[in-house]
Amino acid sequence: MKFSENWLRSHVPIQATRDELSATLTAIGLEVEEVTPLGESLGQVVVARIVEAVRHPEADRLQVCSVDAGQGELMQIVCGAPNARAGLVAPLALVGAKIGELTITAAKLRGVASNGMLCSAKELGLDSDASGLFELPDDAPVGQALAEYLGLPDASIEIKLTPNRADCFSVRGIAFDVAAACASEVVAFDAVAVAPVSTRSLAVELDAGKDAPRYCGRVIEGIDPAAKTPVWLAERLRRSGVRPVSLLVDITQYVMLELGQPMHAFDLETLHGPIGVRRSRAGEQLALLDGRQVTLDDSFLTITDAGRAVALAGLMGGLDTRVTETTRNVFLESAYFDPAAIMGRGRKLGLHTDAGHRFERGVDPALPPQAIEVATRLVLELAGGTPGPVVHAQLPEHLPQPVHIRLRRARIARVLGIQIDDADVVRMLRALGMHVEAVAEGWEVMAPSRRFDIAIEEDLIEELARIHGYDRVPTTLPGGASRIAMPSETQLDELSVRRQLVARELQETINYAFVDAALLERWQLTEGLVPLANPLSAELAIMRPRLLPGLVATLGRNAARQAGRVRLFELGKVFAAAADTGAAPGESQHVAAAVCGDALALQWGEPARKVDFHDLKGDLMALAAASGAQLEFQPSTQPFGHPGRSADIYREGVCIGWIGQVHPRLAKALDIDVDVIAFELQLMPLVQRTLPRAGELSRFPSVRRDLAFLVPDEVSWAAVSASVRTTVGPLLREVQLFDRYVGQGVEPGFKSLAMGLILQDNSRTLTDRDVDAVVADVVAVIEREHRARIRS
């Protein structure tokens, strides 16, 4: 954004110097890229009129001009500019004037005396145009100092705007920020409505919904086509990087630069029906102002006249309806278009216009009525004419609504680390154009409609920091007590679980937390599932209810690639739908393992064999021993497990998992042709542990007695061992199952269980009588409670 320093100061009275203003702009986020001083050395440059211009007798490209500079007599100036002619008003540098590094002196050019220099805009440092003399209006006062006439000295300031600051694509928008930073106030803006004189108007129809919710238009008739752009307006445009074209076009450009509202002027006589705003039709063609004929798709917004497209909304007008030097009747347009409807459309056609640049970032939706009044007043003042009524079409339901934000004192202090006085908070926010009301904990703030970037409390805090000054926010290192949690001695951490399993020659794998619904159906896990609203694919549409489906699938892929021994484990979350509708799904941490193939790595010391249930159970018991968990196993009825080789896992009477061989039918459905042994447990019940207590070591010897019982097939070792522990009490150090036998010598429906009892007392040596009494009690209890008999 480029603008005139004097123009900005006309909107916000400040005492800051140019350097201070530049520093302030950069400090508040409007980074100054370039400052170009204008007219600081024009003390001896005056307005002059060429009375006569004749060809130089010795040079075809030079002219000898008689110039009236208000000095009382005509001055002779030799000039080589192609536009030098009688009647032209242009700047004249008198003898002694310093133009840049050049000091003007009286001289002879090809033998003809020259007592000054007629200047171009570039030579004066006012513009880049060096094609000819700087042409001034015919009514410019001859002899007046040029600096006084042009309102110099001044400076052209160019700032770099971030995409969120669309409100600063106008002089007035910048003025609000400067006023807030310099503790000043923006000059009140006069947007008094111009009363209509005629009744002529054009109806407006909005057919683009939210893309074009507001459109203002006005007819002005009887404009003087010969009216010229006044020098003050042309200079403000020129110093803002816009070259003056014609009065009507210059007025629309001026309003855009001052207020931030792009406008367009149509030649009324080229319009033949009501004005419409609609989406373009695929294949529709339009001749643009730059002379190009473009073919549109259906993504553009168009301004239409009796159905035909006459302009690209928010981008560029049409060639057929443009204003010309003969235009006497115009239709002024001022509208609000949704940024999303304009964004990227210009790039499709290779267009980059000031209007499009503003609309795609967001223009104040409240501006169109004000802008059309300002433009009307300028047209009437500078070119005359008869205004009609303003036609104001809008779709209120699609206009952006004001945002009310609660700003808390405590939040300001917490985010910025400093306290800002209440009075300063209110002053800064109001200077930025915000409506502020005090409430108990702070303020209720409503951002102005031009500030699309303010939506939450943190946006307001950022504004305060920006205006208050980032340099006034102290640099402090983060502080506070360490929040590193102390490791719990009553819980085995996940790293320890991983290390235990790795020590058992298991390898960790990490699978997706999403699984295929078809896979879960094969596992018969179809209840309490949590589907994803936006899955990555149909095969990853369900949050996993167990780890095993994904883990076994991974094991199968490895086994299918000639991996003879696969041992995998995984720690991860599983998910279940909540019982209450609308509640968040439940999640818990599980640990699972799956193995197949050889039980032992390739070696020569032991014969090769396949892994079985007891191998993986041994791995699980080693993990349980690390936490001191006493696990119990009961026959399982899980449909995915082998009916005779799987068990539910209990701790303290609560089922916490499953272990066993995957059902052969399921393995076959998964294209796995080897036996798969697996377990899965809830992690938290497994890793909870009781702190060990130191006990007295007995100084007396222990005694071992071996017993073998014939027990019914349905009686488990867990039940038998529990009876033994209850019966023997503190004398029992350990009970071990060392043999299980079914076959010859054992009647059908029974099995042989052989156990070893290790007994010890802390106070004395046990005698044979003591041991025999304990054994007799054990035999009696097992025979009575489990319908067993001692095996002879």
Curated annotation (Swiss-Prot):
InterPro entries associated with the record: aa-tRNA-synth_II/BPL/LPL (IPR045864), B3/B4_tRNA-bd (IPR005146), DNA-bd_dom_put_sf (IPR009061), Fdx_antiC-bd (IPR005121), Fdx_antiC-bd_sf (IPR036690), NA-bd_OB-fold (IPR012340), Phe-tRNA-ligase_IIc_bsu (IPR045060), Phe-tRNA-ligase_IIc_bsu_bact (IPR004532)
Disulfide bonds, paired cysteine numbers: none
Cofactor(s) for this UniProt protein: Mg(2+)
One Pfam family, short name: FDX-ACB
PROSITE patterns, A to Z: B5, FDX_ACB, TRBD
GO cellular component, one term: phenylalanine-tRNA ligase complex
Coiled-coil residue windows: none
Residue ranges of every copy of the FDX-ACB domain listed in the record: 698-791
UniProt entry keywords in alphabetical sequence: Aminoacyl-tRNA synthetase, ATP-binding, Cytoplasm, Ligase, Magnesium, Metal-binding, Nucleotide-binding, Protein biosynthesis, RNA-binding, tRNA-binding
GO biological processes: phenylalanyl-tRNA aminoacylation
Domain spans labelled tRNA-binding: 39-147
Entry's family note: Belongs to the phenylalanyl-tRNA synthetase beta subunit family. Type 1 subfamily.
HAMAP family found in the cross-reference section: Phe_tRNA_synth_beta1
The protein's name in its UniProt record: Phenylalanine--tRNA ligase beta subunit
Gene name of the record: pheT
